[in-house]
Amino acid sequence: MAGLREFFKETVEEKLLQQMPDDVLQQTTPATQLLEKRRELEQVERALATQKEDFHVRMATLDQRKAELERKEYQLQESLLKFDRFLKENDARRERAEQKAASENEVAQAREEQVQNLRAELRSLQERKTRNRDILQRYSIFEAFMQTVLGEYPEYNEVQDVITRYKTLVATQQDLRSRDRNNQTEIERVRREMARYKEAHRVSMLDCSNKLATLRTAKERAHTETLYWENQLSAVQGAASKRTLLLGQIKMYAYPPAHPGTCPTRTWLALTREPRCCHEPPR
């Protein structure tokens, strides 16, 4: 009997008495709620049919047990009569008969208790059946509404088609949410990778800037040194030019041309020729 109660509790009572959470009711549409109620009604009907069949089987078993109990009671009466005769005939038989009667009384008492338990369970099942009938009557309005919905949407021939469509949409929504989570994870990974690349680029640019500053400093130092040596070279060249000019002037004054009209080439040769002694006559 405990197994029957557990089966009923698992298949009917919990499915009928449980209430959907408020947040789920707010998120679902009336049509979805009707589909859910329709599914629960079908499950209740199947469970009630199973319970009804099981109840008939158990009632038949109970009737058999009751008949057996009546037969045993009749046998007990016969045994009591025999017990009286056995008491007069033999004390030993009387003792055995008493033991047998006591044993049968225990069995009868146990069976009577079992009958009482079965009757109590039967009353409980009848009460639950009444409650289930009331629940079915309350849910009948949802069935009527579902039929109205089917009339307004001819693309759905049966309620099961609507339920199948709903399940498909739910599965699609779950798949899209899973893809969105995967995409968010990939985006976060790319962002972290980009941040690492930016940091590496910043460090590289900073290093290049430091190297560029060092090279610019070296360039400025080299440019300063170049200007210094160019100035030195210009000074040396200027001094050399002045000395060459002075030497030319000295030669011109020291060796004037012999007479006007002298060939310039000879005059230049005369100026560039090594000076002779003043006592050496010109050639």
UniProtKB/Swiss-Prot annotation:
Keyword Isomerase: no
Coiled-coil ranges from the UniProt annotation: 31-139, 174-204
Record keywords: Coiled coil
UniProt keyword annotation of Coiled coil present: yes
Pfam family, one: DUF4200
InterPro entries in alphabetical order: CFAP_domain-containing, DUF4200
Source species, domain of life: Eukaryota
Recorded GO CC terms: cytoskeleton
Family to which the UniProt record says this protein belongs: Belongs to the CFAP73 family.
PANTHER family reported for this sequence: COILED-COIL DOMAIN-CONTAINING PROTEIN 42 LIKE-2-LIKE, COILED-COIL DOMAIN-CONTAINING PROTEIN 42 LIKE-2-LIKE-RELATED
Protein name, as recorded: Coiled-coil domain-containing protein 42 homolog
Organism expressing this protein natively: Monosiga brevicollis
